[in-house]
Amino acid sequence: MEKVPMTSAGFAALGEELKKRQSEDRPRIIEHIAEARSHGDLSENAEYHAAKEEQSHNEGRIAELEDKLARADIIDISKLSGDTIKFGATVTLVDEDTEKKAVWQIVGEVEADAKKGRISITSPLARALIGKKKGSTVEVNAPGGAKAYEITKVEWR
């Protein structure tokens, strides 16, 4: 069983989603199925089929969450330090072409969310950053072409 690296915050968030799906969503969906079933003929009952589809989706996500939580390798970022970039680091970069600054935290695949400034450890940018230090320059082959970034800060938060 392959371990899935994740932060303690990511583990907690997945646990909360699992709890909600099991204790709130599952009973609500079962109620919808029972209500739709009471309307008679199931072969032409759109409400019933929609509720069954929702149940299938929810149960699939529950199984996925249980699997990820069971395989979690929780990494406590508060205990990490140093100036070398690794899993959990929050890195400030400056694009060498545009001088635009960006801040990214390197997290597990299940936690990655670009809108929240979190990139997967398996992403091209994270792979280029791992092992580097403040002051280094990294080149990343992005969909829009090669980009160069200077690492201006490495933090652990």
Swiss-Prot record:
Q: Which residues form a coiled coil?
A: 46-73
Check the record and name the Gene3D superfamilies matching this protein.
Transcription elongation factor, GreA/GreB, C-terminal domain (3.10.50.30), Transcription elongation factor, GreA/GreB, N-terminal domain (1.10.287.180)
Give me the stretches of Basic and acidic residues compositional bias.
16-60
Q: Does the keyword Coiled coil apply?
A: yes
InterPro entries on file: GreA/GreB_C_sf, TF_GreA/GreB_CS, Tscrpt_elong_fac_GreA, Tscrpt_elong_fac_GreA/B, Tscrpt_elong_fac_GreA/B_C, Tscrpt_elong_fac_GreA/B_fam, Tscrpt_elong_fac_GreA/B_N, Tscrpt_elong_fac_GreA/B_N_sf
Pfam families, A to Z: GreA_GreB, GreA_GreB_N
Q: Where is this region: Disordered?
A: 1-60
Q: Which GO terms describe its biological process?
A: DNA-templated transcription elongation; regulation of DNA-templated transcription elongation
Per UniProt, what is one GO molecular function of this protein? RNA polymerase binding
Keywords in UniProt for this one? Coiled coil, DNA-binding, Transcription, Transcription regulation
- The question of whether Ion transport is a record keyword is answered with no
So what does this one do?
Necessary for efficient RNA polymerase transcription elongation past template-encoded arresting sites. The arresting sites in DNA have the property of trapping a certain fraction of elongating RNA polymerases that pass through, resulting in locked ternary complexes. Cleavage of the nascent transcript by cleavage factors such as GreA or GreB allows the resumption of elongation from the new 3'terminus. GreA releases sequences of 2 to 3 nucleotides.
Give the record's family classification.
Answer: Belongs to the GreA/GreB family.
Q: PANTHER family recorded for this chain?
A: TRANSCRIPTION ELONGATION FACTOR GREA
Q: What is this protein called?
A: Transcription elongation factor GreA
Q: Which organism is it from?
A: Bradyrhizobium diazoefficiens (strain JCM 10833 / BCRC 13528 / IAM 13628 / NBRC 14792 / USDA 110)
